[in-house]
Structures are given as structure tokens and as C-alpha cells.
């Protein structure tokens, strides 16, 4: 029997809403005429969409669409011009927030709970700490001062609201600074560290420390793994179900009298320990954050015992330039900020985010050129990196340029 009108309309709408062309961004490209192309360029409108989704998490505006349809989005220089314009728009903050969520692994802050012993912890505080890190990241990247990666990692200031000045015991100079791009009105750039309670950069933000911890105690393993994987791009295997036939015990929830979290974890890296093969790459870095409890608050004692934040960068097969001991949190982060390996990793994380995939051999030349631009004059300019990514062959083509030969 034929469909009645409502049933027919329902079928049409269902067909539209379940179509791959509605659900996905499809990129067919425009293969050059004749022969087998080494790369398939995106069409101008496809490139405009990819550019807008990466920099704005939104659709192209009229200016970008007009540039695409008018033949002004055809070269790397054209794309760089549009990218520079788009980064000056407040909409750029949304994409940077999404990147920060994934890079620092903090997107699930709304699910973080802590033991009731932490009487100041609440869902509202977790949300504020989360927003602090997102706003600090986007404001640092978009600042007119053209900040570098080192500024992000070593700054003594963060974007906090009045509640967070209490969490950080910040000076009373709150609200003297102006807001940055895309910053909510009540989040201001404020010094969050002091001589008695030091903080350095985004890795010591409360959100980063709290989410990489347990409900009651800090976790040198989680925090060290975060640095190893997210900041150094060095993989550590997931824990096995058992070691030597013995099931992995759950992490400690209490500390015996006179001991610290560190003393509970040191057996992981003890000589001849069956756990040391993996934990030696994580825990000694995580010890560098031991002055911060499970909520990310600064502490000097744990269980009545002084806390030590000394640690070691154990040589990893994937690392070339960062090994040896550090004397505490700020020394550890200073070493990270001075490491070319960290700069390369951050550039690689942006490339992966922009392409929506892990890099392949065919991306080698693009990655090399992107890093060369990023490291110009040792500036490691965060905005310049984004422009370099979008004007690369890998970004502008559906199928990247074959990197089998020498890079130009």
C-alpha cells in the first residue's frame, strides 16, 4: 500500500538523518587530470570545512566560504592568511579547549570524585578547576604576545576565578589583570604559586593533578604516565591482569603511620622488581608531583611525614634528550620545557588532532616542515604552529604527499 503523507515525510527525514553525508564530513578531493597523483588535494569547500572544524569546531563563516568559492583558498599562503584571521576570532577558544581536554586527558573532570576527607572538594570545584585549565590554555595560545610552549609549561600565573584563589591560596591581587581572548568574565590571570607553595605551568593545574590521582591518595603512576605519554609522546603498556601469576593488587587507599604515598610506590621501581619494567618510566616522574595531594592542593607533609618531590627521568627507548635526576617539581618542569623532545611531541599532538588520525610515513615531510616552522628562532610559537599545521601538505590533501623521496 502507498505511504500516506506523514509516513512519507517520516521516511524522507529518516533517510536524510541516517545518510553518511549528514552524519560524517566526507572528503572526496579533486584528483588532478591524468596519471596517478602523488596526492589528492581537497576541494576548496572541503578544505574550508576542515580548516573551520580544526580552528573553530564550527562551520565556515561567510568570509571563508567566499574565499573558497572565489579561488582564494588554493595555496598554502591562502590558507595561512585565513588561519591567522580565524585565530583572532573568539570562536578559536572552543577548539583549543577541546584539544586541551584530549591532550591533558582532563575531559572527564565532571566525573572526578574525592574522599569525604577532602571537605572542600565538590562537583562545583571540579568544574571550576576544569575551566581554569581550558581558559589558561586557550588564552596562552591566543595571546597577542605570541606565547611559546615554554610559557605554557613554566608560567607562574593561571586563569582563575575568586573561588580558586582560595584553593591556590593566591595573593590578594586577584582581578587586577585583564581578561584574555574567550575568557569568562570572572576568570582572570593571577599568580597561583608562591615561595611556600610553588606552582609552575599548566601541568601543576589542579585539574591535571586531581584527575591523575586516586580518590584518597595521589598517584605517582598516573601522573608519571601522563607526562610520559602526553608530554613526551612515549608509550607505556597498559598494566597486565597479573604479574608472575599474581593478580595486580588495587592501589593503596590508606598510608601506614610514618609513611607517605611515595614509600608505598617505591617498591614498583625497586631493583629486580617484576613491576619495574614499566613503572620505572612512570613513577620516578610522578614523584615530582608528590607535593600535591589527590585534589591537586599543595602539601608539605603526608601522614605527619615530610614529602619529597625529587625524582628521575629514566632513559626511555623513545627519548633522546631528557634523562637524569631532578630536585623537585619546578626543576622537573624546567627540564621538560627545555627539551626539544617535548617540543616535537607537542607539535605531533597538534598534527594528530588536526588530521584526526595517527601520522603515517606519508606525513613525514609535512611533520618535518611543521616542526621547522614551530622551532624558528627557538620561539616555539603556539599560534605559528597552528598556522603551520593547516598550511601543510598533509592538511591540505586528502591523500598526503608521498614521502618516499627527499623532503623539499
Which residue ranges define each predicted feature?
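Axial heme c-ligation environment in periplasmic c-type cytochrome domains
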Residues: 355-358
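Active-site substrate-binding loop specific to GH73 endo-beta-N-acetylglucosaminidase modules
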Residues: 1-341, 347-348, 352, 365-377, ...
Amino acid at each position: 500500500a502507498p505511504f500516506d503523507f506523514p509516513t512519507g515525510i517520516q521516511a524522507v527525514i529518516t533517510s536524510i538523518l541516517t545518510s553518511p553525508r549528514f552524519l560524517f564530513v566526507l572528503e572526496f578531493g579533486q584528483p588532478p587530470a591524468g596519471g596517478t597523483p602523488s596526492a589528492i588535494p581537497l576541494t576548496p569547500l572541503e578544505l574550508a570545512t576542515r580548516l573551520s572544524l580544526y580552528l573553530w569546531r564550527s562551520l565556515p563563516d561567510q568570509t571563508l566560504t567566499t574565499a573558497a568559492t572565489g579561488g582564494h583558498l588554493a595555496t598554502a599562503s591562502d590558507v595561512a592568511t585565513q588561519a591567522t584571521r580565524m585565530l583572532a576570532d573568539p570562536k578559536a577558544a572552543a577548539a583549543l579547549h577541546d584539544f586541551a581536554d584530549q591532550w591533558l586527558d582532563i575531559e572527564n573532570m565532571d566525573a572526578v570524585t574525592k574522599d569525604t576527607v577532602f571537605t572542600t572538594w565538590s562537583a562545583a570545584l571540579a568544574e571550576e578547576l576544569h575551566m581554569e585549565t581550558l581558559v589558561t590554555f586557550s588564552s596562552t595560545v591566543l595571546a597577542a604576545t605570541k606565547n611559546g610552549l615554554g610559557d605554557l609549561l613554566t608560567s607562574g600565573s593561571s586563569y582563575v576565578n575568586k573561588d580558586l584563589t582560595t584553593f591556590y591560596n593566591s595573593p590578594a591581587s586577584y582581578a587586577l589583570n585583564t581578561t584574555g581572548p574567550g575568557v569568562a568574565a570572572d576568570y582572570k590571570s593571577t599568580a597561583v604559586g608562591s615561595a611556600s607553595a610553588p606552582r609552575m605551568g599548566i601541568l601543576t593545574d589542579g585539574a591535571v593533578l586531581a584527575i591523575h590521582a586516586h580518590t584518597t591518595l595521589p598517584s605517582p603512576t598516573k601522573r608519571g604516565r601522563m607526562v610520559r605519554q602526553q608530554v613526551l609522546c612515549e608509550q607505556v603498556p597498559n598494566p597486565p591482569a597479573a604479574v608472575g601469576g599474581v593478580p595486580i593488587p588495587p592501589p593503596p587507599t590508606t598510608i601506614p603511620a610514618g609513611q607517605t604515598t611515595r614509600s608505598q610506590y617505591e617498591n614498583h621501581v625497586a631493583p629486580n622488581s617484576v613491576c619495574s619494567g614499566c613503572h620505572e618510566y612512570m613513577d620516578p616522574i610522578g614523584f615530582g608531583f608528590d607535593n600535591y595531594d589527590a585534589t591537586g592542593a599543595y602539601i608539605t607533609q603526608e601522614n605527619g611525614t615530610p614529602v619529597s618531590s625529587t625524582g628521575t627521568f629514566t632513559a626511555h627507548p623513545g627519548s633522546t634528550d631528557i634523562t637524569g635526576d631532578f630536585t623537585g617539581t619546578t626543576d622537573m618542569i624546567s627540564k621538560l620545557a627545555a627539551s626539544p623532545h617535548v617540543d616535537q611531541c607537542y607539535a605531533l599532538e597538534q598534527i594528530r588532532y588536526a588530521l584526526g588520525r595517527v601520522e603515517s610515513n606519508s606525513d613525514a615531510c609535512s611533520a618535518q616542515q611543521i616542526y621547522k616552522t614551530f622551532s624558528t628562532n627557538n620561539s616555539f610559537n603556539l599560534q605559528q604552529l597552528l598556522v603551520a599545521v593547516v598550511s601543510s601538505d598533509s592538511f591540505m590533501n586528502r591523500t598526503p604527499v608521498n614521502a618516499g623521496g627527499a623532503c623539499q
